[in-house]
């Protein structure tokens, strides 16, 4: 059994990196500790230019770099020095003049950055597939019993600190080896994803010939947290985040206080945050069981997020109990005080949490307080996944959104300016409500939300019931539907409730009947031409 605590000293290191961040200081520290440096190409030149003693790999192997750098380190004196088992292969290594290499610091050609360039064609991509680098990484990781592999510049400082303490323990080398295999796995996945989108039937294999979906789908996620249980107590669960960080999200958020996030906390917080991101003006979204139960937008000069919270809460105070609250502005102390004094809340998330808000919420130790950072106004494209038994559904993220100029007025009466503001507000909310989704809204406040019904008419009925229960007036409100109305009954019921304007995608075989129903009731109706099913 391997001794977990015995420290491995480093006498010889091979350094060959594409990302040269911190490598000069790292190599200088190694030399100061008496480590001999082997290096290649640009890394060797950089070290020598900075006065660091190093031996070029070609001089060590007696074999020059060739084929425009395609062959540099693929040599027995390199891989024998890395793979050689110190307790078994010493005689063979000595016989062939192979020196042991105790540490390998390698990172790979920037394939992802290369293929992301709009002018990248297939030959350019191929030349940026690293061969020698992954081979050294895998060799060192395989022989982690005797060799340390470093693929991340962020580990340089810790490695040096350990060497100053006498060497690297087996546990450290094992962890570095795992990082190395994760690194090469992600790298090969990127290559497979790229090549898998190439249309092989074309003569010119450039970026224009790429499809959207690769033949095999590779994506890497890193475990961020093991959870007490999953969606239900009898299910085990963990939270994995994308290896490559994107825009501000629940995955990138920092938890400032509170109990550990549960499986359902993460899912609901994601729903709340993604909804509130839809609004440019100060907004509050309250979510329960992944559905918005209250949303409001209030300009800064009319009360901002403090007023928005009051209005969102007023939509459905019962459902807000134990809910998730998201803001798109910094959480201030006054708003935080209003929340914790009024209701039980599981999670509060905002781009920034003020010191005053932190102090207020600290009195409620179990409340989970998350700070996620700012996000760009222009939403980044990406992928959504849905697991099915034996498969994975992959689609582009639903970042589609409409503006006033995109609306098609289909009724005799055009909506007023205020109705247009409310229609777009309600449409943004409906996008995040489980289908079939109906949202009633007025003055950029949700009045009633009907979610998840098999019948669209029943969703509308529930929205009306919610409004009545909250003491909110439906008369004079607008209505949003995430998909078209298949029959006129949805509009007839809306007219009876006092709805004045409707926003929906359109596209039903009976659109003319639906439009006629709206005209009969003097309801203004607009089509978006875009559906927002959410299952």
Curated annotation (Swiss-Prot):
The keyword ATP-binding belongs to this UniProt entry's keyword annotation: no
Keyword Hydrolase: yes
Catalytic reaction equation(s): (6R)-10-formyltetrahydrofolate + 5-amino-1-(5-phospho-beta-D-ribosyl)imidazole-4-carboxamide = 5-formamido-1-(5-phospho-D-ribosyl)imidazole-4-carboxamide + (6S)-5,6,7,8-tetrahydrofolate; IMP + H2O = 5-formamido-1-(5-phospho-D-ribosyl)imidazole-4-carboxamide
GO molecular function per UniProt: IMP cyclohydrolase activity; phosphoribosylaminoimidazolecarboxamide formyltransferase activity
Record's GO cellular component terms: cytosol
Biochemical pathway: Purine metabolism; IMP biosynthesis via de novo pathway; 5-formamido-1-(5-phospho-D-ribosyl)imidazole-4-carboxamide from 5-amino-1-(5-phospho-D-ribosyl)imidazole-4-carboxamide (10-formyl THF route): step 1/1; Purine metabolism; IMP biosynthesis via de novo pathway; IMP from 5-formamido-1-(5-phospho-D-ribosyl)imidazole-4-carboxamide: step 1/1
MGS-like domain boundaries: 6-151
Alphabetical list of Gene3D superfamilies matching this protein: 3.40.140.20, Methylglyoxal synthase-like domain (3.40.50.1380)
Superkingdom, natural source: Bacteria
Biological process according to GO: 'de novo' IMP biosynthetic process
Record-linked Pfam families: AICARFT_IMPCHas, MGS
EC number: 2.1.2.3, 3.5.4.10
Alphabetic keyword roster: Hydrolase, Multifunctional enzyme, Purine biosynthesis, Transferase
Family, per entry: Belongs to the PurH family.
Notes on the domains: The IMP cyclohydrolase activity resides in the N-terminal region.
Name of the featured protein: Bifunctional purine biosynthesis protein PurH
Organism this protein belongs to: Pseudomonas aeruginosa (strain ATCC 15692 / DSM 22644 / CIP 104116 / JCM 14847 / LMG 12228 / 1C / PRS 101 / PAO1)
């Amino acid at each position: 059994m391997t001794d977990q605590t015995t420290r491995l000293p480093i006498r010889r290191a091979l350094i060959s990196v594409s990302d040269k961040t911190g490598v000069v200081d790292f190599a200088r520290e190694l030399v100061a500790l008496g480590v001999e440096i082997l290096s290649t190409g640009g890394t060797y030149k950089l070290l020598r230019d900075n006065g660091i003693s190093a031996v070029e790999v070609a001089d060590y192997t007696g074999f020059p770099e060739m084929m425009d750098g395609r062959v540099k380190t693929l040599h027995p004196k390199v891989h024998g020095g890395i793979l050689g088992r110190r307790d078994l292969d010493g005689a063979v290594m000595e016989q062939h003049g192979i020196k042991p290499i105790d540490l390998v610091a390698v990172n790979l050609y920037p394939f992802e950055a290369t293929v992301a360039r709009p002018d990248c064609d297939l030959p350019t991509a191929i030349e940026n597939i690293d061969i020698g680098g992954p081979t050294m990484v895998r060799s060192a990781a395989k022989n982690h019993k005797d060799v340390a592999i470093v693929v991340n510049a962020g580990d340089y400082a810790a490695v040096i600190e350990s060497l100053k303490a006498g060497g690297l323990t087996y546990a450290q080398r094992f962890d570095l080896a795992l990082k190395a295999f994760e690194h090469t796995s992600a790298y090969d996945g990127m290559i497979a994803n790229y090549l898998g989108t190439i249309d092989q039937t074309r003569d010119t294999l450039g970026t224009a010939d790429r499809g959207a979906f690769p033949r095999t789908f590779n994506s890497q996620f890193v475990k961020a947290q093991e959870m007490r249980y999953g969606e239900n107590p009898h299910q085990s669960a963990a939270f994995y985040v994308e290896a490559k960080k994107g825009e501000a999200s629940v995955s990138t958020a920092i938890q400032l206080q509170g109990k550990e996030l549960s499986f359902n906390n993460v899912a609901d917080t994601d729903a709340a945050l993604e909804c509130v991101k839809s609004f440019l003006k100060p907004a509050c979204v309250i979510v329960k069981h992944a559905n918005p139960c209250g949303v409001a937008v209030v300009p800064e000069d009319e009360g901002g997020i403090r007023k928005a919270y009051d209005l969102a809460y007023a939509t459905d105070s019962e459902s807000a109990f134990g809910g998730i609250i998201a803001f798109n502005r910094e959480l201030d102390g006054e708003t935080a005080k209003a929340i914790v004094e009024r209701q039980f809340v599981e999670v509060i998330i905002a781009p920034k949490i003020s010191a005053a808000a932190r102090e207020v919420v600290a009195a409620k130790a179990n409340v989970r307080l998350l700070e996620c950072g700012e996000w760009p106004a222009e939403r980044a494209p990406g992928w959504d996944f849905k697991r099915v038994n034996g498969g994975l559904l992959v689609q582009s993220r639903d970042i589609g959104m409409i503006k006033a100029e995109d609306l098609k007025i289909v009724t005799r009466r055009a909506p007023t300016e205020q109705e247009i503001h409310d229609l777009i507000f309600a449409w943004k909310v409906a996008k995040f409500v489980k289908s079939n989704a109906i949202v009633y809204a007025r003055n950029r406040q949700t009045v009633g939300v009907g979610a998840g019904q098999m019948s669209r008419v029943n969703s509308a009925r529930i929205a009306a019931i919610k409004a009545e229960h909250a003491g909110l007036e439906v008369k004079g409100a607008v209505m949003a539907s995430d998909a078209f109305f298949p029959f006129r009954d949805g509009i007839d019921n809306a007219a009876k409730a006092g709805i004045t304007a409707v926003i929906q995608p359109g596209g039903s075989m009976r659109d003319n009947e639906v439009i006629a129903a709206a005209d009969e009731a003097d309801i203004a109706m607009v089509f978006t031409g875009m559906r927002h099913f959410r299952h």
